[in-house]
Amino acid sequence: MAKAKFERTKPHVNIGTIGHVDHGKTTTTAAITKVLADAFPDLNEASAFDQIDKAPEEKARGITINISHVEYQTEKRHYAHVDAPGHADYIKNMITGAAQMDGAILVVAATDGPMPQTREHVLLARQVGVPYILVALNKADMVDDDEILELVEMEVRELLAAQEFDEEAPVIPISALKALEGDPKWTQSILDLMAAVDESIPDPVRETDKPFLMPVEDVFTITGRGTVVTGRIERGSVNVNEEVEIVGIKETSTKTTVTGIEMFRKLLDSGQAGDNVGLLVRGIKREDVERGQVVVKPGTTTPHTEFEGQAYILSKDEGGRHTPFFNNYRPQFYFRTTDVTGVVTLPEGTEMVMPGDNTEMSVKLIQPVAMDEGLRFAIREGGRTVGAGKVAKIIK
């Protein structure tokens, strides 16, 4: 087979395996690494099942999650792949965004078909904004009857369509175990799966290509020069002499011009996603800007006070609450750099939320926050994290 050469210019895509416990998510991950390592040895190393299964702990927004990262390449792309072994870890990762996903491989056992967690994962993927799902129909070697495979495929497609994912997404029958054992037929099924991943998961939009946004971390005055706002640029880029808008927390937004950009005490012509910068802003007093606001390309982000969110509430063992909460719960919602108090309304039919639950909620904040759908937040009580969530829908 022709050797693919390593190119830094390859698109980088973050993906993950999702699906019901015991349907073979981790085995599928291991099979992908092995088959690609055999096909493109100078690009890939195989990761054994037990390496992936012993997922190291990570902290994201104050929550501990067990999660494994592996990387591999096809001829077209470089992939970072996350696998969360436990159902709870999976849910926590989806909601906190510890590992972003540009697309997901839904693993469904052909012997079982979609199960309750399959549905829950797909629903959650929709709510946290995973852009694309395709399907690995695993354990296909154990099903002799093609009609059964077709039935399972139909069920999976209905499930995807119900959550507004692509009903025509590739559904690839595989046997991860047989591929790990080196069976040529099933090794090919993994190559087919990765060809489908290459083709169907769209290239992600890079952060630098999005409109400029920088959360304000600090504000100070430089005598003789004016007001400087500092922070890490979250997305996009900004140039000297460009107009920007300062949004959130206050009733009205303020427009101003960036007259200087500084990083590590050096002056720059522009700053881009990932840079920690100080922006010198024209005609703005120190008291006009505060932590928690964002500096943006004018007109690209708006402040809101009411939204629907999907949240995971920490269990007692994770350092969360010891007791449930009810309607009209009033914690702080930590967005980007600041806490804002909000009042929680639970979905109809939900009496209370227990520590360890994941839930939908409507929130009404006491101050406006610059937000887009998909923005993540922590739920805090007096500085202690008790939950994490993501904005699913902006109401007002």
Swiss-Prot record:
Domain tr-type G: 10-205
Region of interest: G2: 62-66
Record region (G4): 138-141
EC number(s) recorded for this UniProt protein: 3.6.5.3
Region (G3): 83-86
Superkingdom: Bacteria
Chief place of localization: cytoplasm
Region (G5), start-end ranges: 175-177
Binding site for GTP: 19-26, 83-87, 138-141
GO MF annotation, one: GTPase activity
Pfam families, per database record: GTP_EFTU, GTP_EFTU_D2, GTP_EFTU_D3
Enzymatic reactions: GTP + H2O = GDP + phosphate + H(+)
Subcellular location(s) of the protein: Cytoplasm
Keyword DNA repair: no
Annotated GO CC locations: cytosol
Key words, A-Z: Cytoplasm, Elongation factor, GTP-binding, Hydrolase, Magnesium, Metal-binding, Nucleotide-binding, Protein biosynthesis
Broad enzyme group: hydrolase
Segments for region (G1): 19-26
Binding site for Mg(2+): 26
Keyword Transmembrane among UniProt keywords: no
Signal sequence region: none
Role noted for this protein: GTP hydrolase that promotes the GTP-dependent binding of aminoacyl-tRNA to the A-site of ribosomes during protein biosynthesis.
UniProt subunit comment: Monomer.
Name of the molecule in the record: Elongation factor Tu
Organism: Rhodococcus erythropolis (strain PR4 / NBRC 100887)
